[in-house]
């Protein structure tokens, strides 16, 4: 029996040895040794391929295809049936980094589970379903006009740092593990925050060293040194004349030499091509690739036509050395080994996470809890909130965001199994017969479209003829034909087919009809799509694009009475993008608020759910409505159509609870007059509607605090393209409508006099602070205690700057003492003499309270020797 056992053991050892033909395939060796061995076996062309974010397979060595690009901004993006948490700007309002950690631990569970399930079903590593997630975005939200500020954790470097570190630790897993759970990515390095429409060409050269080291770099430094983030993404723009992805000051002297970063630098997508196409600092792709690799950019992201495929030619022409490529390749390959991607799933613990964990009950509860904690109560006149359910006979829910589930998902989002809208949340608290709903108006447009689709006809059928092919180029057999007599709105979200027999991926469609105009007029086509989209009228192309997001387009078109118009839409699903298409056309008529007011004659209380959406603000978007440009905003006021409707409701004597959904600050000065209560709900994720209803009806006491300044008007803002911090954020501006750190509660907290263990310390000492807090009200609630520091007589420094915070919960009538420990770095500021961040001797003011507003703060003073 023992002989048989020995033979079996030797047999399996033999199999293992045969399977491990090369040293790099041996999981018992260190990652560096394995990477060196693999590099020694690669050709120069193969090395270049492995430095592209879509790394092709190398079959002769058993190297599988690998994609570096996935997104997990607030859940696994571009995937169905995942948990969609609130947008990061909303999470920042919770001031709860412990909850943020739990959320991103859940997100990394879902990524791993979906990834391995996909492989088990025979799939391959693909874009948007991989082990490298380009999250978090830790750029400072310095200006509310920036469309991507919603992806960040606000305007303050310390808050950004606390939240960003929690994100990375949740995504990457414990440092004690042999294999990383995922690779997280700190982006966009550095000094990056719009304008979106100019990001490929702008040269930012007005950032003084103080702003650089006190504002723009701290979060990146912390994620590198404290969270061991494994990837850093360099940005599109130029900083002081050099593109960020070719900027040796940023990538070598600061990132690697000062901070000791030893992992992967990845370019933003297409940023290296910008060297020669937009920035004009390189003559062509060959020289751009050479500049980037020498400057320290290891991995190139691009849609196609990678500049890094020119690296072998660059070596042959002596522009770079092969050792330069090997240096970057070592970092990239060690990443793949550390993720366990080169090893069998059987020895990678993270591969055991079951797919049943995706959007499970625990994750849904986390999404709901974060949505609740993210809500900020900005105004509550005469304590109109919370509403008493039993006393409500009828309530109106009005507004363009009341039933918009897609708005709640924000951007860089996945698709949940179920989304609870605000209307649904309110109905769940009352009953359908007590709730009246009307959209009221659109987000921006002050006109409504009277659809003409019913007036169209094709092949003796009303509306559009829809023809489908299971190819992307309208070729092959037709697999389905339908007739659509209503506005087109189709999606594959939730695994829905466009038509029976049409695949979820790799299909194309044509929608055709004829329209005879009844009069001379200007009509408008309204459309949006993810994928390839083209609209033709009488064979003339009116709009044509490829896009990975569904964004609204409005195309005016003049028609003549009696003339026939052949309308054709060509659509194709592309890449692994989810398929979406929306289309309508007709005449526009002015909104008549009087009709709505008549419908509300017996209703006194209105919940208006408005604001913005990810279709208006976001990343480099072809949006050109008044007040919006290229994903950014040109003013920060509430769109006039919503403002006018709120005025009409006020003039009709209605009590108004305004729920503002946006990823950025809105100047709500007029709304403080027209509205009785204002709730800032951000883009609250899949359970956002229930969280909003919980707050409105008092089932949850709001505790969120603003992570950004809400200005009074656009007139208070400096030039968008000026990156100086002067006049920006609470640190250099103090005339806000609603200040950073502000947020009301249904209870009242009394903050007592703080005690410090010392009033004089040395530069390397800690300072301990004790602050008594009492809940003076009738409700259990949570409060966020905030600590700010200012260097006395620092005339060009910040008014104050956040250095610590704690979120506490207290029952009504209860008290506690909150303990803070300020480490020495809390007193670091930029020193012009040394050119470094350092602690200098002198007096320091410490402010403490529940917002950054002067009247909400108390002060004490200490001295540092």
PLM features per residue range, with description:
Residues 1-22, 346:
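Bacterial Sec-dependent N-terminal signal peptides
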